[in-house]
Curated annotation (Swiss-Prot):
Residues 1-19 form the signal peptide. The gene is Sowaha. InterPro entries: Ankyrin_rpt, Ankyrin_rpt-contain_sf. This is Ankyrin repeat domain-containing protein SOWAHA. It comes from Mus musculus. Pfam families: Ank_2.
Length: 548
């Protein structure tokens, strides 16, 4: 185990070099996503002694800044090679790979811009923020990448056919896809490089010679078929997400697909997405599940801040008042209408209903629907409250009517305590609102009050009883008018006396009867009642009993 740990540390120290970074960029056409670069070199940065991790990360940042720049294209960060004029082709200085060259000179040749090319010379590392000088940058772009394929070819040779000194070399260099294929590397060469036969052979006990700086231990790992399938699916998912256009250019949906630098501790750019932080921490385990990882202390999870647009939206919507600033933010990003407050779970529609702002509620739904991002009118907060619950709770009847009639809110939705919106109405709320929200207590309002002894209204009584009451009152009034022939005489005279009209209105069948003076021309009503009525009127006029 100690020998394997030492080999892993040596591979990590040799693999993270400026030549390796430059070769990786050249293999991908001089431009690669920041996420791919970080996911490729993160196992090298985490391997080895945990105490030297910070130094390895600083060196890696310096290597990246020496040969490339970070650019953001269409919301995705790319690492692009520096544009330097190339001098005419001449004899290039390959990395020393012949027998007899010490490892110190090989490592010095791999990083010409960083160290002096003399054994034992003092190192003069550059700061990560300073760009490399003009004299050193072109030489790095020329000398370092050309020797990378040949050395990787030596590593990928089969275990049974090790390269012999002086033997013929294959003139055809392998392609980048073949170089990146880890299945061709045998298990015996996973952590060791080919021994270079020197004039002084190594003793039999030392079986692990120092690796060359351009070798990438990521390619030497032999993962199983499951790991290769997971890796292919992950790369396809990243490519699909990067090529997928977002609707209406929403900045909320344009999430960065790069692995966040803050999760790796590299600080090449500001962190944005917590989901990608988790992917960056789980990336090495997905790519190399068969390798043994050194036990390291878990890094504290950094707090993920909100984007400036989201933060401004949450602060302004909490006031519950519609403004031009809110309208502008919503026009730029329709997805903000569904953004929830992380403390209460309120959306902007919840705040509008709580404060009774009908214009804000209407504009939120209309603008979001026109932009292709419909708003859920029945969205629940952390307590299960819908906007209709909040409007009823705070006594905003107009907002509640707008939510139900115009926006289509459901009145039967219950919160997490099992209550519907009508149960939060204040005492004295209007009858129309209670009926709109489906209050079942309105049925008992029409029932007769048994405690007061009332007979109830006409609506609550039986229809037969209502018809009998109306018929009895109409018949009594009609018979009262016919029973008093004095009233008929006053009406015949044209209602000359005002008292006659008052007597007519106050007539009732129970009033005392007066003796009338019988005139010769007209028979009285009493005579008519005692006669037998022939013809079609027989049986229509009631007969009165004879006077006693």
């Amino acid at each position: 185990m100690a020998l394997a740990a030492a080999a892993a540390a040596a591979a990590a120290a040799a693999g993270v070099s400026q030549a390796a970074v430059l070769g990786f960029l050249r293999e991908h056409g001089g431009q690669v996503r920041n996420s791919e670069l970080l996911s490729r070199f993160k196992p090298l940065l985490d391997a080895g002694d945990p105490r030297g991790r910070a130094a390895r990360r600083d060196r890696f940042k310096q290597f990246v800044n020496n040969v490339a720049v970070v650019k953001e294209l269409d919301g995705v960060k790319f690492v692009v090679l520096r544009k330097k004029p190339r001098p005419p082709e001449g004899p290039e200085a390959p990395l020393p790979s012949s027998p007899g060259v010490p490892a110190a000179l090989a490592q010095c040749a791999a990083v010409p811009a960083e160290d002096n090319c003399a054994p034992g010379a003092p190192h003069s590392p550059q700061r990560s923020g300073e760009p490399p000088e003009d004299s050193s940058a072109p030489s790095e772009l020329q000398h370092t990448p050309e020797t990378l394929p040949s050395e990787v070819t030596q590593v990928e040779a089969p275990s049974g056919s090790a390269p012999q000194p002086g033997g013929p070399e294959d003139p055809a260099l392998p392609r980048s896809s073949e170089l990146a294929r880890p299945a061709s590397v045998p298990s015996g060469l996973a952590l060791t490089s080919t021994e270079s036969p020197g004039p002084e052979p190594a003793p039999p006990t030392a079986q692990v010679p120092p690796q060359k700086p351009c070798m990438l231990p990521v390619r030497c790992v032999v993962p199983g078929p499951a790991a290769l399938r997971i890796r292919a699916e992950e790369q396809g998912l990243r490519r699909q997400r990067s090529e997928e256009p977002s609707p209406r250019g929403s900045p909320m949906l344009l999430r960065r697909l790069s692995v966040e630098e803050s999760g790796l501790g590299l600080h090449l750019g500001p962190g944005r997405s917590p989901h990608l932080r988790r992917l960056s921490r789980a990336g090495p385990r997905l790519l190399s599940p068969d390798t043994e990882e050194m036990p390291v202390a878990p890094l504290p999870s950094p707090a993920v801040p909100l984007e400036p647009t989201e933060h401004e939206w949450l602060v302004r919507t909490a006031s519950g008042r519609w403004s031009h600033q809110l309208h502008g933010l919503l026009l730029r990003d329709r997805g903000l209408a569904a953004k929830r407050d992380f403390m209460s779970g309120f959306t902007a529609l919840h705040w509008a209903a709580k404060n009774g702002d009908r214009e804000m509620a209407l504009q939120l739904v209309e603008v979001a629907r026109r932009g292709g991002a419909p708003v859920d009118v029945n969205a629940r907060s952390h307590g299960g409250y819908t906007p209709l619950h909040l409007a009823a709770l705070h006594g905003h009847e107009d907002a509640a009517v707008l939510l139900v009639v115009r926006l289509g809110a459901q009145v039967h939705v219950r919160d997490y305590s099992g209550r519907r919106a009508y149960q939060y109405l204040r005492p004295g709320s209007s009858y129309a609102l209670r009926r709109l929200l489906g209050d079942p207590g309105l049925r008992s309002m029409m029932e007769p009050d048994a405690a007061s002894g009332g007979s109830g209204s006409l609506v609550s009584r039986h229809p037969v009883q209502v018809a009998a009451t109306i018929l009895s009152s109409t018949t009594s009034a009609f018979l009262g008018v016919l029973a008093d022939d004095l009233m008929l005489q006053d009406l015949a005279r044209g209602l000359k006396k005002s008292s006659s009209f008052s007597k007519f209105l106050g007539a009732s069948p129970m009033a005392p009867r007066k003796k009338t003076k019988i005139r010769g021309g007209l028979p009285s009503f009493t005579e008519i009642s005692h006669r037998s009525t022939p013809g079609p009127l027989a049986g229509l006029v009631p007969s009165l009993p004879p006077p006693t």
